[in-house]
Amino acid sequence: MTAEIIDGKAFAAGVRAKVAHNVETLRDTHGITPGLAVVLVGEDPASEVYVANKHRQTVEVGMASFSHKLPAKTSEADLFALIDQLNADPAVHGILCQFPVPEHLNERAVVARIDPAKDVDGLSVVNAGLLASGERGLVSCTPLGCLMLLRDRLGDLSGLEAVVIGRSNLFGKPMGQLLLRENATVTMAHSRTRDLAQVCRRADILVAAVGRAEMVKADWVKPGATVIDVGITRQPHPDDPDKTRLLGDVDFAAVAEVAGAITPVPGGVGPMTIACLLANTVTACCRAHGLPEPDGLAV
């Protein structure tokens, strides 16, 4: 068996097209332009690249992009003052603070300062609680993207056995909650799980998100399963020590011979994250104005 390769890049392009259509409708019908504000504290090179990508994609779909770059020595009080200003700004429907922030700032406190209705990263305890209780909130972008890929590949997830490896607040827990909402039977696996390989072999849906390169081997995977690889590890390239390569949590070449479908790294889950950030911003905009939520962009 050779697995179907799930093309996250192509699917994300489709999500962005839906976002752009909804942005155009909001502008032409209601005179509203969704706005996303991104705050960057310090000069982390990787963060600067991520922020630039978010700005570019935000503008490409027709939304307003508000970028705020603050010096590394910015105090908590000054950062909170900016967040309060963005919370109160009716032109801003989504707020994201790019992490990591400098060590003197507390990331949890930063997230807590953002209005949950504008927390388009879905990281606040309010949005996490809404998800856990089955209520309507804003969902963390990467789990939302994975769910979109799974729905597209499998349709109805009811009754399927799903195993999520990793229990982080950022991904694992919300991924498990989303799968429960879809009526899958969910097992949350982690570093203390006994006989992890045996647990994984039960899964119709296997989601790996622990950051250990090629941990999931072919004999961990049920034949025909759908495998979603969320892990990213950068390692020296075996053929050129001056270059690096990205590896996922799954031994891709081996598992692709067993699975029914699999996401590659890169090009699988990664592109979905920003696409879902844009989707969440449109959803937040519609909710702020009491308008119907766009089809296919929210859960």
Curated annotation (Swiss-Prot):
Query: Per the record's keyword annotation, is Hydrolase included, yes or no?
Result: yes
Protein's gene: folD
Question: Could you tell me the Gene Ontology terms of the biological process aspect for this record?
Answer: L-histidine biosynthetic process; methionine biosynthetic process; purine nucleotide biosynthetic process; tetrahydrofolate interconversion
What is the disulfide pattern of this chain?
Answer: none
Give a single Pfam family match. THF_DHG_CYH_C
Identify the EC number(s).
1.5.1.5, 3.5.4.9
Give the source lineage, highest ranks first: Bacteria, Pseudomonadati, Pseudomonadota, Alphaproteobacteria, Rhodobacterales
For this entry, the protein name equals Bifunctional protein FolD
* Pathway note: One-carbon metabolism; tetrahydrofolate interconversion
Catalyses which reaction(s): (6R)-5,10-methylene-5,6,7,8-tetrahydrofolate + NADP(+) = (6R)-5,10-methenyltetrahydrofolate + NADPH; (6R)-5,10-methenyltetrahydrofolate + H2O = (6R)-10-formyltetrahydrofolate + H(+)
One GO MF term attached to the UniProt entry? methylenetetrahydrofolate dehydrogenase (NADP+) activity
